[in-house]
Amino acid sequence: MVAAVLRLLFVRHGQSEWNALGRWQGQADPPLSDLGRVQARTAADAIDTAAKGAASPVAGIVSSTLVRALETATIISDALGVYPLHLEPDLVERNAGAWSGLTRSEIDEQFPGYLANGTRPRGYEPDDVMLDRTLRAVDRIIERFAPIDEPATVVVLTHGGVIYSLESHLGAPFQRKPNLGARWVLVCNGALQLSSTTTLIDAASATTPDLL
């Protein structure tokens, strides 16, 4: 018997105050900007429409514990009436080490050549560590919501670094996500299958941070 498909929608949070200032966040914890809150409300409508269109209702919402993701998740949870909101610490953004809080120009000044040649500073979270915790989080999400008898959607509010790590693991080339950019991942019989990308807000209100 083929199990029903669990659809995971990995969503980058709304614009944060540091996104608006061009500061690399890492695991620093700035809140959403006013625009980020508007983006989250718009995204809730898009998620509802997508889930209904696929006959795959939203069964749950999971969030990183960082406030910019948690605020986004709370707005979406309230708009959709989906409770409780589940927290997952392993969904937090990549640790940016000494770059946390810096702008691109400040990084270029303090760490000349690093961005251009792919060198990372002390304290920057390695790719393998990032992927290990990302997959642990995904495993726990699947364990919580599967198996299922009918198709269902779980919305996962997280960060660019987490989504890029998962996409790379599943064979997708790097493509920068805007705030409220998202990637569908399907779970069928326990296996992960990369699906489409989407942006949950219109182009006029989209913001694409230059740095994580």
Language model features with spans:
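Active-site-proximal alpha-helix that buttresses catalytic centers in soluble enzyme cores
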Residues: 2, 6-82, 110, 127-131, ...
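Acidic, low-complexity terminal tails and accessory targeting/binding regions
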Residues: 2-7, 43, 94-106, 147-150, ...
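Beta-strand elements within well-structured catalytic alpha/beta cores of enzymes
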Residues: 7-11, 62, 148-158
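Short, well-ordered beta-to-alpha junction loops that form the rim of enzyme active sites
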Residues: 14, 64-66, 90, 156-161
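Short, active-site-adjacent cap segments at secondary-structure transitions
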Residues: 17, 68-70, 93-94, 162-164
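Glycine-rich phosphate-binding loop signature in dinucleotide/nucleotide-binding domains
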Residues: 50-57, 141-152
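Phosphate-handling substructures
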Residues: 76-136, 196-197, 211-212
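A short beta-strand-loop-alpha-helix capping motif that often carries His-Thr
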Residues: 125, 153-164
